[in-house]
Curated annotation (Swiss-Prot):
Subcellular location, record wording: Cytoplasm
Protein's name in the database: Ribonuclease HII
PANTHER family: RIBONUCLEASE H2 SUBUNIT A (PTHR10954), RIBONUCLEASE HII (PTHR10954:SF18)
Family per record: Belongs to the RNase HII family.
Cofactor: binding comment: Manganese or magnesium. Binds 1 divalent metal ion per monomer in the absence of substrate. May bind a second metal ion after substrate binding.
Chain's role: Endonuclease that specifically degrades the RNA of RNA-DNA hybrids.
Amino acid sequence: MQKVTIQEAEHLLQEIMSEEDDRFQILIKDERKGVQKLISKWYKQKELAQKEKEKFLEMSKYENALREKGLTYIAGIDEVGRGPLAGPVVTAAVILPEDFYIPGLNDSKKLSEAKRERFYDEIKAQAIAIGVGIVSPQVIDEINIYQATKQAMLDAVANLSCTPEYLLIDAMKLPTPIPQTSIIKGDAKSISISAASIIAKVTRDRMMKELGEKYPAYGFEQHMGYGTKQHLEAIEVHGVLEEHRKSFAPIKDMIQK
């Protein structure tokens, strides 16, 4: 191989998958600083990819254990929006295929918005089935947020296109005959729950952005309904909306004044 330019070396390293590659052996002997920097970057990327693979395998242990028992339709379930002062609570149930793999998959709260959007599209494309459950602020006020979350999860399961054989749920037990395991911080421990958290989060964020367009004075597209200073000040100035949860403090106190 003739001596390549730095740019050519960069393109080659994108193709090279192993240190055993003859082209890599030539590049590693190239003493130019630019090439050595690229080699160092290549090693770091490989190390990161390996760590992501190990993390993914660790997060697949619940699903793999159930598959070993002959189960196929394993639904991960998670919720988003228990804490906000406005907007619905949204849940998702996701059944993933055995060969599903997205490196870097994690709890939706730990991902950037851009990554969540990308993963959302990939999960949508690969999942066997996805069900979403949405419970309005009015129902939250009627039955309380805990019961509303439970109801939204049951709705998400009912909205799946196939009946799950097993449920993996983030920190909740559901009144259903379907066998289940409740996992504390499940969105960081199970790929199915993690996928559900991303579907639920992106779905709810999009709804809150639409609400932001409808009521620009409240800034819903920025705080997603949480009780930020900006949000509380907007309520003080412009009043309580039908999208607000009247049973939540401090809105409850504002109404009673």
